[in-house]
Regions:
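Alpha/beta-hydrolase active-site loop
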Residues: 99, 127-152
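N-terminal cap/lid segment of alpha/beta-hydrolase-fold proteins
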Residues: 44-69
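The feature captures the conserved acid-bearing segment of alpha/beta-hydrolase catalytic domains
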Residues: 189-248
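Bacterial N-terminal signal peptides
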Residues: 27-37
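Primarily recognizes the serine-hydrolase "nucleophile elbow" in alpha/beta-hydrolase
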Residues: 147-148, 152-208
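C-terminal catalytic histidine-bearing segment of alpha/beta-hydrolase fold enzymes
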Residues: 242-285
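Conserved alpha/beta-hydrolase
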Residues: 104-124
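Short, surface-exposed "cap/lid" segments of acyl-processing enzymes
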Residues: 67-106
């Protein structure tokens, strides 16, 4: 079994760092991630592009990949403007290097089906998802994809966002808290400060979330919108969640713009370990 190529520190809201239960939970999480990392890839269906009707005259496109017997499904929200420009053959016009987009197969290898979500059909030009992520229409589009996955797979459905994709994951979960929403969300490299007129995740109505939430952050994330110190505030605002936990990761390499996909912000060099740990956490819920 290969060693996990990342230093993972799971921080739990209910316990202090030296509490025995904290140590047991951390050891269990690492064991689960190591087990997933050592397993062979699951048999899977061929990736396919799916267009689901959502609002009148609008469809939501995503790349769907499922292992032979999925245990859960994850809708993956990329950061940036979110317009992946996915063509019918499954090629990305933009965003192929995004952390979640480039790591999609790792989730499938762990037994999790993925829907790599594009902008909807009425947002296929600039600004794509910019200025749209907190809208009712965005939540309606997500509701349709969640329903499709549940109907096809009969498994729990999660939203996983990275960077600006965390604004989508959190906003959709809040909007659909009354019904039709996800079974849980994962926020990686969360937007914790905003200077473009948008909304930081910590300024959303997180108290309405009654689902599990995992926060994953690199301890050296240099993006000005994502200071690791403010994950404390994020966890405090998730008090209503039945299970709100935080993973702080270290290691890897960083190159380019600190807010881009191959900086620490995008878990460069840590993809396999981080995804395995996320998968283990999701599948344990």
């Amino acid at each position: 079994m290969n060693p996990l190529p990342v230093s993972l520190h799971a921080r739990f809201r209910c316990f202090g760092a030296k509490h025995p239960a904290m140590r047991r939970a951390r050891a269990w999480l690492l064991a689960m991630a190591l087990a997933l990392h050592g397993y062979p890839a699951h048999a899977q269906d061929q990736p396919r592009v799916v267009d689901v009707p959502t609002r009148p005259g609008v469809t939501q496109r995503f790349l769907f990949i499922a292992p032979d017997a999925p245990k859960a499904a994850a809708i993956l929200y990329a950061g940036g403007h979110g317009g992946l420009q996915l063509d019918p053959s499954g090629r990305f016009g933009w965003g192929a290097g995004n952390f979640l987009v480039r790591s999609r197969q790792l989730f499938v290898n762990d037994g999790i089906a993925v829907a790599v979500i594009d902008a909807p059909s009425d947002r296929q030009s600039a600004p794509y998802l910019n200025g749209f992520r907190l809208s009712k229409e965005h939540a309606d589009d997500a509701r349709a994809v969640i329903a499709w996955l549940r109907e096809q797979l009969h498994v729990p459905v999660w939203l996983v966002g990275t960077s600006r994709g965390t604004q989508s994951a959190a906003a959709v979960a809040i909007a659909l808290a009354g019904g039709g929403g996800p079974d849980g969300i994962v926020l990686t490299s969360t937007i914790l400060r905003e200077d473009r007129g948008g909304t930081a995740v910590t300024d959303m109505n997180l108290a309405s979330l009654r689902i599990p939430v995992l926060v994953v952050h690199h301890q050296n994330d240099g993006c000005k919108h994502c200071p690791v110190s403010e994950t404390d505030t994020l966890l405090k605002k998730l008090e209503a969640s039945p299970k709100a936990e935080r993973m702080i990761v270290s290691g890897g390499t960083s190159r380019g713009d600190p807010c881009e996909a191959f900086a620490y912000h995008g878990f460069n060099g840590l993809e396999s370990g981080v995804v395995d740990a996320i998968s283990a956490w999701m599948l344990a819920r």
